[in-house]
Amino acid sequence: MSNTRLTLFFTNIFQLLDSKIQNYSINFPIKILLLLLGFFIATVLATVFGQTGDWDVLVAGILVAMIEILGNKMYSKKYISKKQVFDISFLSLIGINYIKIGLIFGLFVDAFKLGS
């Protein structure tokens, strides 16, 4: 195959996509497990505390505060500047962030279930 600009362009695009896919596939099963754990926690919280109706506002306030504090920690300059692959505190923050994403998604889906 000749090395035209078009073939070089597509070769570079495919190499970039391959490197991105391999980068995201690291610990993929653990990430999915943490997302599902967050989804399960959201379902449990909505079911248990939603039965009485008295605790809804308090639990929602605690969850929003927890999500905001975690987001502040996750995206602060301290952690962004020293993203090291083997830093235990950063890896645990990433894991908790995946649980947080699952929690938000679970509450979002539960709100749609209640609305229909």
Swiss-Prot record:
Q: Which UniProt keywords apply?
A: Chloroplast, Plastid
Q: Which domain of life is it from?
A: Eukaryota
Q: What is this protein called?
A: Uncharacterized protein ycf20
UniProt similarity note: Belongs to the ycf20 family.
Say yes or no: keyword Chloroplast present. yes
Q: Name one GO cellular component term.
A: chloroplast
- List the lineage, top down: Eukaryota, Viridiplantae, Streptophyta, Mesostigmatophyceae, Mesostigmatales
What's the source species for this entry? Mesostigma viride (Green alga)
* Record localization: Plastid, Chloroplast
- What PANTHER family does the entry give? PTHR33787, YCF20-LIKE PROTEIN
Please name one Pfam family that this protein belongs to: DUF565
